[in-house]
Amino acid sequence: MSKNLFMDLSSISEKEKGSVEFQIFRLTNRVVKLTYHFKKHGKDYSSQRGLWKILGKRKRLLAYLFKTNFVSYENLIIQLGIRGLKKN
């Protein structure tokens, strides 16, 4: 996999695991894994649907974080190396 998003999960408290930032981190890890999966299995359409659902959920969480805590949003975007939301 091209991105190494590994994080020591034992050092994170239960409260932090429910945070928006951590949820976005977990969804990004799943996106990276599925992207790698599609390099071998290009016609796996049921997994593609799952990827679209994950991307939609991550987009909604990013929009929420953008509205509530912009500084944290910017830091997370830089840390994960993902694109931000489109400007309308």
UniProtKB/Swiss-Prot annotation:
By what name is this protein known?
Answer: Small ribosomal subunit protein uS15c
Localization (cell):
Plastid, Chloroplast
Chain ranges passing through the membrane: none
Keywords of the record: Chloroplast, Plastid, Ribonucleoprotein, Ribosomal protein
Taxonomically, the superkingdom here is Eukaryota
Q: Tell me yes or no: is Plastid among this UniProt entry's keywords.
A: yes
- How is this protein annotated for GO cellular component? chloroplast; ribonucleoprotein complex; ribosome
Under Gene Ontology molecular function, one entry of this record is: structural constituent of ribosome
Q: Record's SMART domains?
A: Ribosomal_S15
| Family recorded in the similarity comment | Belongs to the universal ribosomal protein uS15 family.
Q: What InterPro entries does the annotation carry?
A: Ribosomal_uS15, Ribosomal_uS15_bac-type, uS15_NS1_RNA-bd_sf
Provide the assembly information.
Part of the 30S ribosomal subunit.
One biological process term in Gene Ontology: translation
What is the predominant subcellular site recorded for this chain?
plastid
The record ties this protein, via Pfam families, to: Ribosomal_S15
